[in-house]
Amino acid sequence: MTQINNRSVWFVIGTQHLYGVETLRQVERHGQQVVDSLNRSGILPFRLQIRPLVKTPDEALALCREANYDSECYGIMTWLHTFSPAKMWIGGLSVLHKPLLQFHTQFNAEIPWDSMDMDFMNLNQTAHGGREFGFIGARMRLPHQVVTGHWQDERTLLRIGQWMRTAAALQAGRQLKVARFGDNMREVAVTEGDKVAAQIQFGYSVNGWGVGDLVEVINQVKDGDVNALVDEYESRYVFSAAAAVGGAKRQNVLDAARIELGIGRFLDDEGCRAFTTNFQTLHGMTQLPGLAVQRLMQQGYGFAGEGDWKTAALLHICKVMAGDLTGGTSFMEDYTYHFAPDNDLVLGSHMLEVCPSIASEARPLLDVQPLGIGGKADPARLIFAAKAGRAVNASVIDMGDRFRLLVNVLDAVEPPRALPKLPVARALWHAQPSLATASEAWILGGGAHHTVFSQALTVDDLRLYGEMLGIEVVVIDEQTTLHGLRDALRWNEAYYRLNQR
């Protein structure tokens, strides 16, 4: 596996001067060996960077302050090789704003039965040193994570990698700018929300631009750039007769390419990595952005329709979290049900905007078809079906006094029959634990009709993300019952009201 970028997680070993110079040298050597091994493993998405031993309160404070201001640092991973009195960490942990992982490991995998002496016991104290550090985390109510396991165990490294990706997603959210072209779809409730509260909680900023500002950039795109992009389309997609050279709708494909280039340039100029559109506010645009949005999502941009900035932001964050993992991640909407004995299904889609990262076809179909809403020219779009396999749907909603993240476990399936007259991309799935329970639980929890659909991420990924942020997480999976979910929602309501700051 290739590491994603040059950013890193700091590997910090806590100890104290009590043990003497030679013991501390051994700790340093062990730490370097562990870091080198983990970096060579091919499992971690980001590099571990070893830092000097932390032996005093001043060193702990200085380290945490430095981590906060280092934009290349995703978070801190601590290891208590020896006993590190936790009071010395209070100052540093009080100011730390980066994610914290306690790696509860030890240098030796097994007890050296024949050779273990008091020198060995003096050096290898993770088992109780980690508990001391863990107490101060609990006492300070720190939203931190703990991974236990030997540093040469692949299962342990996979969990560290999961934490790293989530830490990267957290930082991406804190740096994210979301552009809204137009406002929300009129009279829709769930796409509304407190953007100031969201920026305080998640870190991302949401601002609006008039569609005219975007149209001006689109109109400045040169024909040569459009033709070059259409050549790329030709190499990647199968064209319908209408969309092909000489086809009745060829100009619509050229217009879609111009829109893609214009939106991409606008977002890059403004530093935005997520955006929303609204089919009710398209003044000056030739067609509703379909193909353009699909391709921009595949490039990592977050998107949601009808002004839904929460889902657009969540999509970009999830794409960062998915990183190098297998499987795609897309904007999605539950569209229609298939009620059948022992085979209830949900068809998910949207008007046009489903990301081709989830496509089962190597070369999706590029077509131009009429669209009954928006009042514009027939839009270009990619048509495909999602791959079969385990997936999740996720939604962030504004509950007024807090944000709630809902996650439903799904099993995507291959369509049992063709859909020859449906000219949009789609996914078909079994909702866990059943369509009836999943939909009722989702509705009781207030989940949005827009979601992020991911075949790369799991419930554990999203739960970890919610825990890092300190937001409410509601999971609907194979174990969910309606009475249990109702109880959990009531308990959560009490907890978050009592825990308001």
UniProtKB/Swiss-Prot annotation:
Gene Ontology process terms (BP): L-arabinose catabolic process to xylulose 5-phosphate
GO annotation, cellular component aspect: cytosol
The entry's keywords: Arabinose catabolism, Carbohydrate metabolism, Isomerase, Manganese, Metal-binding
Reactions the enzyme catalyzes: beta-L-arabinopyranose = L-ribulose
Binding site for Mn(2+): E306, E333, H350, H450
Keyword Manganese: yes
Positions in coiled-coil regions: none
Enzyme category, top tier: isomerase
Disulfide bond annotation, renumbered to this chain: none
Presence of the UniProt keyword Manganese in the record: yes
Pathway: Carbohydrate degradation; L-arabinose degradation via L-ribulose; D-xylulose 5-phosphate from L-arabinose (bacterial route): step 1/3
Signal peptide: none
One MF annotation (Gene Ontology) recorded for this entry: L-arabinose isomerase activity
Gene3D superfamilies listed in its UniProt record: 3.40.50.10940
Pfam families assigned to the protein according to its UniProt record, in alphabetical order: AraA_central (PF24856), AraA_N (PF02610), Arabinose_Iso_C (PF11762)
EC number(s) on file: 5.3.1.4
Named cofactor requirement(s): Mn(2+)
Oligomer status and interactors: Homohexamer.
Function (record text): Catalyzes the conversion of L-arabinose to L-ribulose.
Family to which the UniProt record says this protein belongs: Belongs to the arabinose isomerase family.
Protein name, UniProt field: L-arabinose isomerase
Gene: araA
